[in-house]
Amino acid sequence: MEQEEEQIDNGNTVISIKDLKKSFENNVVLNGIDLEILKGENIAVLGRSGSGKSVLIKIISGLLKPDSGTVKVLGQEVDKISGKALQALRLKIGFSFQSSALYDSMSVRENLAFPLVRNKRNLKTKEVNMAIESVLNDVGLSQTINQMPSELSGGQRKRIGIARTLIMKPEIMLYDEPT
């Protein structure tokens, strides 16, 4: 059995959480959370408003520190790394938070190009354009490529936000209220 667990830890476990706790002042938000997510799994965390779902995602992504417990993402203990190591890990994690977080002054094309140009600077314009067209097709919004976020419905903005996350081809996707 021990060998089986070791094998899981050596490649199939993408997120491992043990006895996670997080409070804000006297409000306990997460208490004793244990979770293991394997490569290829899709997990939904359900709960009422204020139950800690967003906090859990922020801890997994390294945006918040847990009070105690361990959180490993792709084998790295998230609250033990910082700087370039944390930045490199975050590039492997796609985030889609509650708001679409689109730049209002940029077209859909520019919003989708931004993370590619910022994080993968050696891409040619043709490669960027092909990636944009592909991801827009994936979310069914090819026709919006030249529109501004203010011209889109709330659902369309949400899907463009998801497309902006997918365009980076992350190893892990974290969605906070994806619909």
Model region roles, listed by residue range:
Residues 162:
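Hydrophobic anchor residue at the start of the ABC signature
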Residues 148-152, 156:
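Conserved ABC ATPase signature
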Residues 105-114:
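Short coil-to-helix segment of the ABC ATPase nucleotide-binding domain corresponding to the Q-loop/switch region
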Residues 46-48:
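The feature captures the beta-strand-to-loop junction immediately N-terminal to the Walker
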Residues 61:
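Helix-to-loop junction immediately C-terminal to a conserved catalytic motif
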Residues 69-77:
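Conserved ABC transporter NBD signature motif
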Residues 167-171, 177:
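A short, proline-enriched helix->beta-strand linker immediately N-terminal to the Walker B motif
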